[in-house]
Amino acid sequence: DQTALYIRMLGDVRVRSRAGFETERRGSHPYIDFRIFHAQSEIEASVSARNIRRLLSFQRYLRSSRFFRGATVCRSLNILDEDYNGQAKCMLEKVGNWNFDIFLFDRLTNGNSLVSLTFHLFSLHGLIEYFHLDMVKLRRFLVMIQEDYHSQNPYHNAVHAADVTQAMHCYLKEPKLANSVTPWDILLSLIAAATHDLDHPGVNQPFLIKTNHYLATLYKNTSVLENHHWRSAVGLLRESGLFSHLPLESRHEMEAQIGALILATDISRQNEYLSLFRSHLDKGDLHLDDGRHRHLVLQMALKCADICNPCRNWELSKQWSEKVTEEFFHQGDIEKKYHLGVSPLCDRQTESIANIQIGFMTYLQEPLFTEWARFSDTRLSQTMLGHVGLNKASWKGLQRQQPSSEDASAAFELNSQLLTQENRLS
């Protein structure tokens, strides 16, 4: 009951509050690595390619007990005392509304939007009861996920993950999916949405490849980030023990299907998935009682959720556009500083938010959401396409106010073609 849950979590807090216990963080931490990288350059006039590879390893060693991973004292108390009261609780009652303001919700939950929202969705969909989940293990699992996102990233952080998870929930509510998905499908979809950018370093795949990063070597330059997100998610699933009561075969199947969902978010493979999806729609042979077809639709839903920012209202969409562009430009600044060759769309001197967004909507987003609307011709689909049109018009208005905007737009047409192959921060 609630009293027992409180006592168990309070016990965790007391253990973590012992003197000498250091909050740990798994995986890469670009802010620290780049800070070391920058400090080194102050001493050395030039940095060799070998030093670049060494300093951008992103590896950190763990010093604390594996058992106590997942929550600091203050964060746990926030979860207990603040997440589900007042305005935050009122917002969760409208979590299926497409105008859900994830930025406001993140402020109301004191930076715990991913934990609060995902836990609520697990409860809303009846997953806790259906799969007999331990609520304390679930909390710990979600906190570990949230902590493995880098808050220093302007875009690829826990708030983005929460936004994608909320969008995925909206798609799961669409009539065609709601009438066909199983609790298993919902479980995998929500976990994949919450972890789809787990431990994102804030740079894109070409950056990792040209610096000979160990992840690029490990995954042979193929879906490097997506493979890392998936493997990181599997690590947390196993570490949390959330599904330890399920048969081993079921756990392996879960890990594989979550991987297939996350790997589908690789933007360089968009044409592959989009062509397959379009082919099924053209033939009219998409049968949602077939598990394989249903899984393809869930892959497309996650792809849509991942890049749905231009489908939100202008106030929300503009904030996301500014954040993702700042992350692009931050990478470009690093590439300039160390003479690595600036990646397409990452040069703040030649690119603009308006040009990047117009190109992204034209070449990547509109084709995807047009096909999704063919599959699910609902009010939500029309709302999303309507927002895309309005937001695109707004960016074009801002573009006309910029000097040399026509030249920049022409340059973007080439860059956007490169984007489909390598550059969107998947």
Swiss-Prot record:
EC supergroup of this enzyme: hydrolase
The entry's keywords: cAMP, Cytoplasm, Hydrolase, Metal-binding
Record SMART domains: HDc (SM00471)
SUPFAM superfamilies the UniProt entry points to: HD-domain/PDEase-like
MF-aspect GO terms: 3',5'-cyclic-AMP phosphodiesterase activity; 3',5'-cyclic-GMP phosphodiesterase activity; cyclic-nucleotide phosphodiesterase activity; metal ion binding
Domain remarks: Composed of a C-terminal catalytic domain containing two putative divalent metal sites and an N-terminal regulatory domain.
UniProt record similarity statement: Belongs to the cyclic nucleotide phosphodiesterase family. PDE7 subfamily.
Name of the protein this chain belongs to: High affinity 3',5'-cyclic-AMP phosphodiesterase 7A
